[in-house]
Amino acid sequence: MFTINAEVRKEQGKGASRRLRAANKFPAIIYGGSEAPIAIELDHDQVMNMQAKAEFYSEVLTLVVDGKEVKVKAQAVQRHAYKPKLTHIDFVRA
């Protein structure tokens, strides 16, 4: 099983997302279930290594958001058009 460390995003919008990507992070969101959606930021290199395995897309993942574990599945993954970079991931609560 995969465990990914995440932080709640303090800023949102295009400029904030670009600053995240320049800092080797990228935005993501957790939604679904009865709880409200959570905008998070992830470390690019950590997730890039994990997503190379097929299990990343089919198994339940554990996101540690501010010390609290959230069980999720990767719903949608957006990649850069020509660079080997992730730009956004949607996670749905499992």
Curated annotation (Swiss-Prot):
Give an example GO molecular function. 5S rRNA binding
In terms of InterPro entries, this protein maps to: Rbsml_bL25/Gln-tRNA_synth_N, Ribosomal_bL25/Gln-tRNA_synth, Ribosomal_bL25_short, Ribosomal_L25_dom, Ribosomal_uL5_bac-type
Task: List, alphabetically, the GO terms of the cellular component aspect.
Answer: cytosolic large ribosomal subunit
Gene Ontology biological process terms, A to Z: translation
Q: Does the keyword section mention Ribosomal protein?
A: yes
Q: List the disulfide bonds.
A: none
> Which CDD domains does the protein's record reference?
Ribosomal_L25_TL5_CTC
The cross-references to Pfam families, in alphabetical order and at most eight, read: Ribosomal_L25p
* Keyword line: Ribonucleoprotein, Ribosomal protein, RNA-binding, rRNA-binding
Q: How does it assemble?
A: Part of the 50S ribosomal subunit; part of the 5S rRNA/L5/L18/L25 subcomplex. Contacts the 5S rRNA. Binds to the 5S rRNA independently of L5 and L18.
HAMAP family given in the database record: Ribosomal_bL25 (MF_01336)
Q: What does this protein do?
A: This is one of the proteins that binds to the 5S RNA in the ribosome where it forms part of the central protuberance.
User: What does the sequence similarity comment in the record state about its family?
Assistant: Belongs to the bacterial ribosomal protein bL25 family.
**Record protein name field:** Large ribosomal subunit protein bL25
Origin organism is Salmonella typhimurium (strain LT2 / SGSC1412 / ATCC 700720)
User: Gene behind this chain?
Assistant: rplY
